[in-house]
């Protein structure tokens, strides 16, 4: 840089996972750890929700300007695919829906969409390159492509488009340090980097077999890990979780690098999940630097997957097993936690990085304000799911077979499927094929069980009957061969062996709840805490009391929350995440509107899931609620657990 060698001491911080009001503080925290650079992905699906409709692209430019003001360099990874534990790996549903396996190849239809994306986003990057006085020092081509494909022509096309659109700083690729990954993911003439969490000498030796010359860099030094719903140390899905991590991280024999010691404590809002010992991580970081390499700490500050944008993985070494949806918190056991606080890992890393820094490492900035006192949300109204769908949903579509989310233009949200069982006919099981991912059911208006496996069974059901299935996406897969798979009912509904045709489907996109005018037109009834539907309320923050907080929802089951119009993300009583992070800039003194979209429902006197699962203990296999329920679709009186309470903000 300017004719002199530069060792990049970088940390990952995704601008879209941090409230803009916190950027300056988080960037200052990275500098105080001893870093001189920040890396960010750019999620295509966040910025182009529909073909040719772009939103908030300027936020990337503002972030890069903040990086420059902080005295940091920037690495930009614009996709089109980003992984990042992000919905669909950053690919828009309107791309993967019609194209399927043709994505991430030189397919002409896919490349037209990609070229449009790059042409739209790069004007935020090109003027901010370091050779023009800005902070951007490197730009990535695709992302870990060697873990997915082998289309060298596709990678060459992307590199050519980046250059044609004005990128003059070095281009690079990043892959696992395995021969087949570097062979599939590298581009001749471009810098190749590797991603791993330990074993730097072995990883760089592999890279040197492919690139005898050039800089060494670990583009993703995995200092922690992420968590999935329904998982945790010692939990029923712990082995599945570890197998998934071994598959993804195990591109470099990474299975043992992420500890599951349950020592997260107060790290982020997860409390349990993948954590890594600070001393172990610091030693691995030191080994990278001792090799003379540059590094990007993934994550330096993880933040939060606001707005229901968290992705999912598939279990197994080849990521082709059961769905494992990722929690809302992206704390990642990073050195700077979800709330921007330094952890033990921060101080360990600072000690390792300080000798390599150019000049003294600055002190950390002052902590961000914290909510002065707990405050309860006063619920003022409730609208049923049918009312919400009528007011905020898309048009109802008739189809011979169930349309997918993609066909209904639903990225995140739910779809209501209605179908008729002809009659008279004997009671047979209803087999729902390809459920992705979770369905709340009704038969002739009576609640049935929740379907939570891809090949699910409901019934027996006699005809004639009317059936409703409210299917929710728990997050599209962001890594592996199941990338881009459709959501909804993807394989049809059968009564005995007969397909039921003539399906009426209507979708509700999550972002529809962010339309304040449309929400204001809904007819709200008296509050019904914990019931399925949209709950409206207010929380009052006293003068001088605004600051970071967490939102607790005791007894609620699963859904999404908005505070002051800001989408916090998904909550789920399944755990391990028990509360949602509320950035202080979302709040204001006085009354703040709160919206809670509860998708499953829990009855007063319960705290767990409001209905039995069709595939778990607690149902009698009849297609209706089994013993211990009152038939209302929620647990009946007398069940154990604390009652449903009003949501509350806690410092």
Residue positions per predicted region:
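The substrate-binding groove and active-site-proximal loops of carbohydrate-active enzymes
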Residues: 8-19, 42-60, 96-115, 140-152, ...
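Aromatic-lined ligand-binding clefts that engage carbohydrates, nucleic acids, or primary amines
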Residues: 427-442, 540-563, 571-572, 594-597
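Glycine/proline-rich low-complexity spacer/linker segments in large multi-domain proteins
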Residues: 473-506, 601-610, 636-651
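Active-site neighborhood of glycoside hydrolase catalytic domains
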Residues: 109-187
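Aromatic- and acidic-residue-enriched segments that line the glycan-binding/catalytic groove
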Residues: 51-58, 69, 80-104, 155, ...
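Catalytic-core region of carbohydrate-active enzymes that cleave or remodel glycosidic bonds
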Residues: 68, 195-242, 271-337, 341-348, ...
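N-terminal carbohydrate-binding accessory modules
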Residues: 1-37
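Aromatic-lined substrate-binding rim segments of carbohydrate-active enzymes
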Residues: 23-87, 159-164
């Amino acid at each position: 840089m300017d004719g002199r060698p530069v060792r990049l001491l970088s940390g990952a911080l995704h601008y879209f996972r941090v409230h803009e009001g916190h950027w300056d503080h988080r960037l200052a925290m990275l500098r105080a750890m001893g870093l001189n650079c920040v890396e960010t992905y750019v999620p295509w699906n966040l910025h182009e929700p529909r073909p040719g409709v772009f939103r908030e692209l300027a936020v990337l430019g503002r972030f890069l300007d903040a990086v420059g003001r902080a005295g940091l360099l920037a690495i930009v990874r614009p996709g089109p695919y980003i992984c990042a534990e992000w919905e669909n790996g950053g690919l828009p549903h309107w791309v993967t829906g019609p194209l399927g396996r043709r994505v991430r190849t030189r397919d002409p239809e896919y490349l037209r969409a990609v070229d449009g994306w790059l042409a739209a986003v790069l004007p935020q990057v090109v003027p901010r390159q370091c050779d023009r006085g800005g902070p951007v020092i490197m730009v990535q081509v695709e992302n870990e492509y060697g873990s997915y494909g082998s289309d060298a022509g596709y990678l060459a096309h992307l590199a050519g488009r980046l250059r044609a659109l004005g990128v003059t700083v070095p281009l690079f690729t990043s892959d696992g340090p395995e021969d087949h990954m570097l062979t599939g993911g590298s581009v001749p003439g471009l810098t190749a980097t590797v991603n791993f969490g330990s074993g730097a000498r072995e990883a760089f030796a592999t890279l040197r077999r492919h690139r005898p010359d050039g800089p060494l860099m670990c583009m993703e030094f995995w200092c922690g890990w992420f968590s999935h719903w329904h998982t945790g140390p010692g939990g029923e899905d712990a082995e599945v979780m570890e197998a998934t991590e071994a598959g993804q991280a195990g591109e470099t024999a990474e299975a043992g690098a992420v500890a599951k010691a349950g020592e997260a404590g107060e790290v982020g809002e997860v409390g349990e999940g993948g954590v890594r010992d600070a001393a172990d991580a610091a030693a691995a970081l030191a080994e990278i630097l001792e090799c003379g390499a540059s590094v990007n700490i993934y994550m330096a500050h993880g933040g939060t997957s606001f707005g229901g944008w968290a992705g999912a993985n598939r279990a197994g070494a080849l990521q082709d097993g059961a769905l494992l949806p990722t929690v809302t918190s992206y704390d990642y056991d990073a050195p700077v936690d979800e709330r921007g606080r330094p952890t033990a890992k921060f101080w360990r890393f600072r000690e390792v990085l300080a000798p390599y820094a150019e000049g003294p490492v600055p002190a950390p900035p002052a902590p961000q304000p914290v909510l002065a006192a707990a405050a309860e949300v006063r619920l003022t109204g409730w609208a049923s799911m049918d009312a919400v769908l009528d007011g905020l949903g898309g048009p109802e579509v008739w189809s011979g077979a169930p349309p997918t989310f993609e066909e209904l233009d639903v990225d995140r949200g739910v779809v209501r499927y209605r179908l008729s069982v002809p009659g008279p006919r004997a009671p047979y099981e209803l087999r729902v094929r390809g459920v992705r991912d979770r369905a709340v059911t009704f038969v002739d208006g009576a609640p049935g069980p929740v379907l939570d496996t891809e090949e699910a069974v409901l019934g027996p059901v006699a005809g004639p009957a009317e059936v409703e299935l409210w299917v929710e996406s728990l997050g599209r897969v962001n890594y592996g061969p199941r990338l881009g798979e459709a959501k909804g009912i993807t394989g049809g509904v059968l009564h005995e062996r007969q397909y039921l045709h003539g399906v009426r489907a209507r979708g509700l996109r999550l972002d529809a709840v962010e339309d304040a005018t449309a929400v204001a037109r809904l007819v709200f009834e008296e509050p019904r805490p914990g019931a399925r539907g949209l709950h409206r309320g207010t929380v009052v923050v006293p003068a001088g009391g605004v600051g970071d907080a967490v939102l607790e929802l005791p007894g609620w089951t699963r859904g999404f929350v908005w505070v002051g119009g800001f989408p916090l993300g998904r909550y789920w009583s399944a755990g391990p995440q028990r509360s949602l992070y509320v950035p202080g800039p979302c709040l204001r003194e006085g009354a703040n509107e709160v919206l809670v979209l509860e998708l499953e429902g829990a009855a007063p006197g319960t705290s767990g899931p409001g209905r039995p699962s069709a595939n778990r203990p607690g149902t009698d296999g009849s297609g209706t609620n089994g013993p211990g329920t009152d038939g209302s679709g929620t647990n009946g009186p007398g069940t154990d657990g604390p009652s449903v309470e009003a949501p509350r903000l806690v410092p």
